[in-house]
Design a protein with these regions (language model features):
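Short acidic capping loops at alpha-helix termini that bridge into adjacent secondary structure
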Residues: 30, 80-84, 105-108, 152, ...
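PLP-dependent aminotransferase-like
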Residues: 100-158
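Conserved PLP-binding catalytic core of the aspartate aminotransferase-like
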Residues: 277, 285-319, 336
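PLP-dependent enzyme catalytic core of the Aspartate aminotransferase-like
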Residues: 315-319, 325-362
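N-terminal "arm"/small-domain region of PLP-dependent enzymes with the aminotransferase-like
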Residues: 1-60
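Phosphate-binding glycine-rich loop
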Residues: 62-108, 126
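PLP-dependent aminotransferase class I/II
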Residues: 65, 211-287, 292-295
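Active-site pre-lysine segment of PLP-dependent enzymes
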Residues: 124, 142-151, 164-187, 191-221
Length: 362
């Protein structure tokens, strides 16, 4: 069997452990999952009703163009339909971008240390060279990224807020970066957690910077992780290129209907943002009380430092708590849950740390 050599360098993406899997393994009755940055509120009631009303039509293919969803997004973002590409989650958008703009093994893709793992996956999958820039206090070093640009640079990926660190780049710094970045290099601002911030880097920026792509998702603040809906905001030219390689029917009909109705449910989004802010404070205070170092976050998760992170992770599993190991030494990423879930996690974490004679980090 002959395969592409670059596939040998790829480690498959490992998602957060499903609740059902832990139930099968340990037979636990109470399990909470704070591993995948999902919305603890669940799903918009408006979206649920629309989903139920649409079930009789699932024998039909979805609208491949996604007209009604694009129309709703365009109205919400105050842009044209031609500036939007819909996808099966924003992960698919990232893959489309890589496929559209990286053409040879000599091409380079720049992203930060401790960045979203999918940037590395899509770069390796197409056989390009990844240029990983050392982080600055767990955050993107934008100037170092600019310094790394050369004639082979095709794409720069910047997650803001970043996953898994939760760090946030202020709008002024993003704007300065966009002004300085070469116009023939695609700059991707991954805004999966945009709704939790007060950033003003919005769709109108694509008129100022033709090389800019904003990517967003319905999986986080909008609570539709299980349906996989993401989208890109970009110039007409970029949108045209992305749609040339986008799979037909890539966003299913239920997902489109759910996204349209969730987008219209402003109360649900407002409540999601509020509970997240309270949860961040709750977890931060809990870590302070335990004397733990954590990275201040603007997303819906916090990364906290503990001795022997994998050992703590496994012991939490046995107590019915699923969190997420990350590629930062001795860090675990904790998604914001409900108040009760956060309390339960903090109590179980304290039990584990006491048994481990944990040396608190600062």
């Amino acid at each position: 069997m002959k395969i592409c050599e670059n596939l040998n360098n790829i480690t498959p993406y490992k998602a957060g452990k499903p609740i059902e899997e832990l139930e099968r393994e340990l037979g636990l009755k109470k399990i909470i999952k704070l591993a995948s940055n999902e919305n603890p509120l669940g799903v918009s009631k408006k979206a649920k009703k629309a989903i139920k009303n649409s079930l009789n039509n699932i024998n039909r293919y979805p609208d491949s163009f996604g007209f009604e969803l694009k129309k709703a997004l365009a109205a919400n973002l105050k842009i044209k339909i031609d500036n939007i590409t819909i996808a099966n989650g924003s992960n698919e958008v990232l893959e489309l971008i890589a496929r559209a703009f990286v053409c040879s093994k000599l091409d380079e893709v720049i992203f930060s240390e401790y960045a979203f793992v999918v940037y590395s996956l899509v770069t390796k999958a197409i056989g390009a060279k990844e240029v990983i820039i050392k982080s600055n206090n767990y955050a993107h070093d934008l100037m170092a990224m600019l310094d790394a640009v050369n004639d082979n640079t095709k794409i720069i990926f910047i997650a803001n807020p970043n996953n898994p660190t939760g760090t946030f780049i202020e709008d002024g710094d993003i704007l300065n970066f966009l002004i300085k970045a070469p116009k023939d290099v695609i700059v991707v601002i991954d805004q999966a957690y945009f709704e939790y911030t007060d950033s003003k880097i919005t769709a109108n920026y694509i008129d100022k910077f033709e090389n800019l792509i904003l990517t967003r998702t319905f999986s986080k603040a909008y609570g539709l992780a299980g349906l996989r809906v993401g989208y890109a905001i970009a110039s007409n030219k970029i949108t045209d290129y992305l749609n040339r390689i986008r799979e037909p029917f890539n966003v299913n009909s239920i997902a489109q209907i759910a996204a349209i109705n969730t987008l219209a449910d402003k109360g649900f989004l407002k409540k999601s943002i509020k509970i997240n802010a309270l949860g961040l404070k709750q977890l931060s205070q809990g870590f302070d009380d335990l004397g733990l170092f954590y990275i201040a976050s603007k997303a819906n998760f916090i990364s906290v430092k503990v001795d022997s992170a994998m050992d703590v992770f496994n012991k939490l599993l046995k107590k019915g708590v699923i969190v997420r190991p990350v590629e930062m030494k001795n860090f675990l990423r904790i998604s914001v849950g409900t108040q009760d879930e956060n309390d339960y996690f903090l109590a179980k974490l304290k039990e584990v740390l006491l048994k481990n004679n944990h040396t608190y980090s600062g």
